[in-house]
């Protein structure tokens, strides 16, 4: 049945917390939509790597940045910084960290279904009930 649906990240289907950050997740139409809040000092390699147990982040992200500044470096050494209003595609094989003293708030529409879960969590999209 085709019908409009609405959810809010203010009442997420799931909240994942990790060192210096959290992700609020909602799922609609088979897409997991995440709002990440990353505090100053957050760095993937120190705050999420212990959960993921991979050398670098192996998730592809498509993000819209609302506030704060985030810098990412790919395994090949290329770097980019993102800030408010930026839309970013960050492929697998990267580290990232908050730049400065302001929290980063971003919306991610492609990389959050399995983000910041222990490595023993089964692969594949998260399952939600509407």
Predicted regions: what they are:
Residues 1-37, 45, 121-130:
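A short, N-terminal "cap"/entry segment at the start of jelly-roll beta-barrel domains
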Residues 43-44, 68-73, 96:
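Short beta-strand segments in beta-sandwich/barrel cores
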Residues 74-94:
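Short acidic-glycine-tyrosine-enriched beta hairpin
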């Amino acid at each position: 049945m085709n019908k409009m649906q609405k959810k809010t990240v203010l009442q997420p289907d799931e909240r994942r917390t990790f060192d210096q950050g959290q992700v609020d997740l909602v799922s609609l139409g088979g897409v997991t939509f995440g709002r990440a809040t990353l505090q100053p000092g957050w760095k993937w390699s120190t705050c999420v790597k212990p959960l993921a147990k991979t050398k670098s982040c192996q998730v592809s992200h498509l993000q819209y940045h609302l506030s704060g500044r985030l810098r990412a470096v790919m395994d090949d050494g290329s770097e980019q910084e993102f800030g408010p209003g930026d839309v970013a595609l960050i492929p697998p094989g990267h580290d990232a960290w908050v730049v400065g003293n302001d929290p980063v708030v971003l919306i991610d529409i492609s990389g959050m279904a399995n983000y910041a879960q222990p490595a023993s969590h089964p692969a594949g999209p998260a399952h939600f009930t509407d």
